Amino acid sequence: MQRRALLGLAILAIGLGIAGCGSATSSAESPKPAGKSPSAISRMVCAEEAVAEIAEVVGAKAAVTAPTWADHLYSCGYRYTEGTMVLSVKELSSWPQTYAYFDELAKTLHKTAPVRGLGQGAFVVGDGSVVVRKDWKILLVDISGLHGMVGSPPSSRDTVALDAAAVILDCWNGD
């Protein structure tokens, strides 16, 4: 029941347009293949605007680690007193690659429930982390390093993951 409520919160957050992070590619543009450096879309997960939007929604400011880029994976950590949440974006170069990577994460991270209305496909995994597919990008909000409730008012780790994913997707959609 709690997971169903959390999934509803994610959908509500998207519907309310909680984030306003910069500009994103329009839905009319074709996906771009992975390049030598991270795309603007990927860099958004660690950008000041997204950090501020996530802090507002979660109710806690995070110290964000320096972003890394390796093997077409862009990531950074959001450090809270309760631990670290890692946001990462895997850039791929085709639909088949994207679907295969998404499906592999579902298997290796132990998908427990789909998330409707988030990206072009999304799911929650065993520890409450969230995976979202949007075009040729896969967002992972990894909360395995968070312990206990986060923010003010306090939110469960699952809620924090869904809220962070919703903020990033709103940034990507240009809302």
Annotate the PLM regions:
Residues 1-9:
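Bacterial N-terminal signal peptides that target proteins for export
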Residues 7, 17-33:
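Bacterial lipoprotein signal-peptidase II cleavage site
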Residues 12-13:
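Repetitive helical segments and hydrophobic/amphipathic motifs
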Residues 28-83, 169-172:
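Extracytoplasmic low-complexity, Pro/Thr/Ser/Ala/Gly-rich segments
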Residues 42, 48, 53, 85, ...:
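Subset-of-secretome marker
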Residues 56, 100, 104-107, 163, ...:
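Charged/polar, solvent-exposed surface patches and flexible loops
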Residues 61-117, 121, 125, 134:
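Short, solvent-exposed recognition patches
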Residues 113-175:
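A short, solvent-exposed beta-edge/loop patch
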